Amino acid sequence: GTGFNFLYNLDQNIKEMIQKWSKQNLIKDLEHVRDGNNLFKDNRGVISNHELTEPINLIGLIDSKKGTIRANHYHPQQEQKCLFTKGQIIEIFQDIINPMAPKITQVVNAGQLSIIKPNVAHTMVFTKDTTFLNLVRGERDHENYGITHTVRHVFVDEKEKNLLMECYKFDCRSCGNTDLKRVVSLGYQPLANNLLKKQNEKCELYPLEMNYCSKCHNCQLSVSVDPKKMFSNYLYTSSTSKVFRNHFVNSAKKYTKELKLNKKKTYIIDIGSNDGVALKPFLDLGFKNVLGIEPAKNLAKLANKNKIKTFNGFLEIKNLKKIKKNADLILASNVFAHSDKLKEMAECMFKLLSKNGS
């Protein structure tokens, strides 16, 4: 009744925009990591080839020991090309032209060529004893250091190096493949729910990046933070969410009906049970035999206080002897996403499950 009409179909236009955006490469390539092409293999070994986009006139041969750092600089005019013949590094780089640019990490393995664009700060953290060739076009004179070839820019210190050496994940958690591709980087971020007591209090920052495994299509974070740091005192309680509570009430009713669960005999385990939000509906329905497994001490204590029996610890092989087995139903909500040991967790679940369990 307003006399207003859309000139175009809104739903169709939104669909077209999404399709168009999906085809755009929004990632600015600051650094390329390339594998060799035209591989030739025989009983003597392997030959691979790398094509360079510009001529070079100098080659530097560099050996570096595990646990050391190189670079911490940028090149104002030249690309830097490094061909790795042995070892492995974590490369950290950042666009110095853009003040909002995140600090990004990338693994480079033996046989790969790393190309860093001009005005990109970068640092190499050597995770293995490593040998590489520095392929230079132009000057490499130390008298020219800081003018056109290399400008010092320290943005990775020993503390950050040690943190990366400790928690970086080089292989797929699912299949073990080491050829992981970075999909997105949000820079370095504090841990979730990491509430500070003082306004200017410092906290540890970790790369928040997603890597993709081309072999099994698993997506995972580039680092694995010590679970004790994350879960020893977990601040989020699931029962504060009405949506969560209603979801688990409906789930308990559904499982009871579809699986024909016996309220007196059925044994139910919930992995990563938080404050017992998924088990409480079963207790309310009259089930007697339930157990939560929760690594956060404060949440396990809260659940036990509320009469929801909970084991405080991680689901891992060494803890199985402390947990009653032969469960008829095992629950796990958003649990694998929080674990670095996917296979061990799955193995533990099968060991806890009864022969005909679900």
Positions of predicted regions on the chain:
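Double-stranded beta-helix
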Residues: 29, 102, 123-164
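Conserved short histidine dyad/triad with adjacent acidic residue
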Residues: 60-77
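Glycine- and acidic-residue-biased ligand/ion/polar-headgroup-sensing regions
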Residues: 77-96
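A short, N-terminal "cap"/entry segment at the start of jelly-roll beta-barrel domains
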Residues: 2-57, 71, 162-163
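N-terminal juxtadomain amphipathic helix
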Residues: 167-243
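Short acidic-glycine-tyrosine-enriched beta hairpin
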Residues: 96-118
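A short glycine-rich, Lys/Arg-flanked "PGG" loop and its adjoining helix->strand segment in the class I
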Residues: 343-358
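A conserved beta-strand element that flanks and buttresses the S-adenosyl-L-methionine
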Residues: 331
